[in-house]
Each structure stands twice: as C-alpha cells, then as structure tokens.
Amino acid sequence: MTTAQKQWAAEGGLRWDGRMLAGAGLLAGCAGVAMIAGATAWAGHLGLSALTLAILLGMAIGHVPGHQRWLTAGTIQFARHTLLRAGVVLYGARLTLAQVHDLGASGVVIPLLVLAATMLSGAWVGTRVFGLSRSQAVLVAAGSAVCGAAAVLAVAPAVKASPRETAVAIASVVLFGTAGIFLYPWLYALAMHAGVAVAPAHFGVYIGSTLHEVAQVIAAARPLGDDAANAAVVSKMVRVLALAPLLVVLACTMPAEGLVLEAGSGEGALRRATGHAWRAMPWFAAGLLGVALLNSGGAIPATWHAPIDAIDTGMLACAMFAIGTQTHVPMLLKSGVRPLLCAGVLWVGLVAGGAAINAGVRWLAG
C-alpha cells in the first residue's frame, strides 16, 4: 500500500471531520484554479489542459513540508479513488456507440496485444534482467499493462506480494505514467511537424493502449481534441475490462505464490480465483459503458452535456491533483532502484513497442 493508504487505514477509513472537510475545500480550490488556468489562451497555446495543470499543481504542493496537515490521507484517497471513478463514469456522457464502432476491431485488438506483450516481457525482464521476485515482476508488469495502481492492488493478493512490493509497483506507475502525460502530446506535435499523417483518433488509441492510469490517459489525450480523447478512453477501457480474466489466469498459472485452496484442488483454486476476479472487477468501466449507452439512446438531453462535462472535469481535476501530491520524487527513489528501472524499461517498451503494434495492426487491417 502507498503511504496515503496506510495512513487512511490507520485513521479508520473515510471520516468527514473538520480536517477532512478543510482538505476537501483545499482540493476543490486547487482543482478550480487548474480549471480556470486551463481555459486561458496561454494554456491552450502551450497545450496544457486543466488536468495537466492539476497534476503539476499537486506535485508542487506535494513537495511542500507539512502539507499533510491539510490534505489528509482520507482526502487524497477519496479524490484518487471515488472522484476518479465517478469522473470516469460521467465521461461516458461524451461517448456514443457510433464512436466506439468507428474505432473498429483494431481499437480492441491493439490494446489487448499491448497488454499481453507487456505482461510477458515484464515478467521476463523483471526476473531475468533485474533479479526481482516473480511476484514483484508481475506487479510492475500489471501496473504498466492494465490500469496502473488499481491493477497492482488487484493483482497483489493473487501473487501474494508483500506491502513493500505493492508500494514500489504503485510508485513506478505514478512516476512513468505522469511522465507520459507530457510525452504523448509532444510526440503528437513532433509527428505533425514531421509531416506524418496521424489521425487524432488513431493517436488516441495509441495513448489509451500504452499509458498506465485512466486519469493519465485522459490528461494526455485531452489537449489533442475530443476525437483523440474519446478514442483513448475507449481503448483504455478495453485494457481495464481485461483485468478480471487476467486475475484468473495469474491465479491459475502461479499456484505456488498465488491463490491456493486445498492441496491438489485445481477446481477449488479456479473457483477462488474467479471469486477474487469478480470482487476486483473495475465496475466503473461498466458504468462508463452504461452512461455511453444512455447517451447513444438520447436519454441524456443536449442541454445537460455542458454541466455534466464541467462536473466531470472538476472530478478528474481533483483526482489528478491528488495523484500529483503523491508524486514525491525523493520518496519514489527510496522505494527501490531495480523495480523502477524495470518499470522504466517497460515504459520505453510501451512507447516504442506500442507504436509498432499500433502501426502494424493498422497496416494489416488496411
């Protein structure tokens, strides 16, 4: 668990006391500042969205000594988890089935290929090159391949990872995923400057199939326009929804370290693995699809879209600010060099190898 999660558990979970309310007010105020700044001309010129500015502001606050007195662990966890998931669900109001259909089969095949390649290479590189335990290598690979910290926390029980291994894997996701927020818009601008014809939706699939966290995907794709952002979210949801079957596969292929029942009971192990996968299922992804279905059927009036978008952006900005406060560079470096190096190699593989997979699938699809 991260430091914030440990503090949150020690404090008894979510308690709306005076400090919590003050922290929520500060969180909302900083997110509001990021939203206002993100709407200015200079931010648009620099390609900085409200979400990018929110995480930058959070990173700045996170390095201020004593900020935990106001931003409690409960406040951070509420923003990182509850508000983030609610924001992802509301994002469905921006999507329609027609947009999903327009991505075609490649929009599903690409993220699944990237996921499989990252899991396999991550487990091999982590154990053979960097000497990590099998459980830690799988954790780092899952965080990079599926959906960031949520995947790490879901996979940890399946491989019986220690709290330290879990915390290090989450730290790597935060570090390289945050770097990706700034890298992908720059890569898109570089491609445009070089005269490479890349459709925004195709680049959105590239972002969604290779970047770690859901919030990071949205933040990286937003500056590129609605087509890129929507495609990125749909592509990312394919990876998120793959978490449940991945947990079953991991539990069944790692019996020595994973979810084991009675000795020799393969059927019992499978039942337990399936139960864990069901409990760890990212239901917010299903919620996003449900809202997208409502929007496709015209159940969401056009006059509601603007306020829903504003509320959604506010929730996501709060989540990005909270994630930023946890991106404390000295703390990340103390978490361990070898796991971070492994995560760095996987990140390079996602950026370069993911681009090759995206290009290859689209070439084969004609």
Curated annotation (Swiss-Prot):
Per UniProt, the keywords (alphabetical) are: Cell membrane, Membrane, Transmembrane, Transmembrane helix
Pfam families xrefs = Cons_hypoth698
**Record-stated family:** Belongs to the UPF0324 family.
Q: Per its UniProt record, what InterPro entries does this chain match? A: UPF0324_pro, UPF0324_YeiH-like
Subcellular location, principal: membrane
Q: By what name is this protein known?
A: UPF0324 membrane protein RSc1111
* Origin species: Ralstonia nicotianae (strain ATCC BAA-1114 / GMI1000) (Ralstonia solanacearum)
- Top-rank taxon, per record: Bacteria
This protein's membrane topology, according to the annotation, is: Multi-pass membrane protein
Where in the cell?
A: Cell membrane
What parts of the sequence cross the membrane? 21-43, 103-125, 137-159, 169-191, 198-220, 240-262, 283-305, 343-365
